[in-house]
A protein has these predicted regions:
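N-terminal beta-strand motif that seeds the catalytic metal site of vicinal oxygen chelate
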Residues: 6-45, 104-113, 206-216, 220-232
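Contiguous mid-protein beta-loop-alpha structural module that forms a pocket-lining wall or clamp
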Residues: 21-26, 64, 85-87
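Short, structured motif recognition centered on aromatic/hydrophobic residues
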Residues: 29-33, 48, 54, 83-85, ...
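Core segments of cupin and vicinal oxygen chelate
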Residues: 36-82, 120-123, 127-130, 135-149, ...
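Active-site-adjacent "gating/activation" loops or surface patches in catalytic cores
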Residues: 78-96
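Active-site/pore-lining binding-face segments in mid-to-C-terminal subdomains
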Residues: 96, 102, 109-186
Length: 232
């Protein structure tokens, strides 16, 4: 039996629109990433700790070729809500600075959605016309066996979809994280699509690769100005 919802009261369905469309396989929000002004990470970490009893679970200091960022991942007591805090690690027109200017202040940079079959989910996203971030170069996939020996994933399937793979295979135990990002969709805000196979991190191994790819995109768009001698 159909159970009435608040949407039945506050909204009217358009004619010819499926009221229960088939989704793309995503189940829950895995995490939200919060971009803050340089020097404000401690303020926001304290805010989440005092009001919601969050605690720090990860800290990253990512350096690109020209810019960098620091990231502190916070989690709720039950582990169900996770919010990494990002700030620019040095002055300049880095990715966080560009976001803050476009968003007119601090806010959520991206929303990560969890699936249990990222291959099928990405195929559905592409079929639906969802714009995804440019895939990494083929060298990324050729280096996977060196970085994650015996990871067990189909590398051709990963490359065909532009999926990133992270985690560990130490002691023959596979703890993997598969992820891909959309293009910006809500102003400067974008989405991350993720599948966890025993890994509860945030793709630290991919973090630097993603950061550098975004840095290259900034250079190509003319947002990040670099010295030609330094770029050579």
């Amino acid at each position: 039996m159909y159970k009435r919802q608040i949407y039945d009261i506050d909204f009217e369905f358009l004619d010819g629109v499926d009221r229960r469309p088939v989704g793309h396989g995503f189940q829950v929000v895995d995490h939200l990433t919060h971009n803050v002004y340089r020097g404000r990470m401690a303020f926001w970490a304290d805010y989440y700790e005092r009001l919601f009893n969050f605690r720090e679970i990860r800290y990253f200091d990512i350096k690109g070729e020209y810019t960098g960022l620091a990231s502190k991942a916070m989690t709720a007591p039950d582990g169900m809500i996770r919010i990494p805090l990002n700030e620019e690690s040095s002055k300049g027109a880095g990715q966080i600075e560009e976001y803050l200017m476009a968003f007119n202040g601090e806010g959520i940079q991206h929303i990560a959605l969890l699936t249990d079959d990222i291959y099928a989910s990405v195929d559905r996203l592409r079929a639906a016309g969802v714009p995804l971030m440019k895939a990494p170069p083929s060298t990324y996939y050729r280096m996977l066996q060196e970085r994650l020996p015996q990871h067990g994933e189909d590398e051709s399937a990963l490359e065909a979809r532009g999926l990133l793979l992270d985690g560990t295979t130490e002691n023959g135990q596979q703890r993997l994280l598969l992820q891909i990002f959309s293009a910006t969709m809500l102003g400067p805000v974008f989405f991350e699509f993720i599948q966890r196979k025993g890994d509860d991190g945030f793709g630290a191994g991919n973090f630097k690769a993603l950061f550098e790819s975004l840095e290259r995109d900034q250079i190509e768009r003319g947002v990040l100005k670099v010295d030609e001698g330094a770029a050579a």
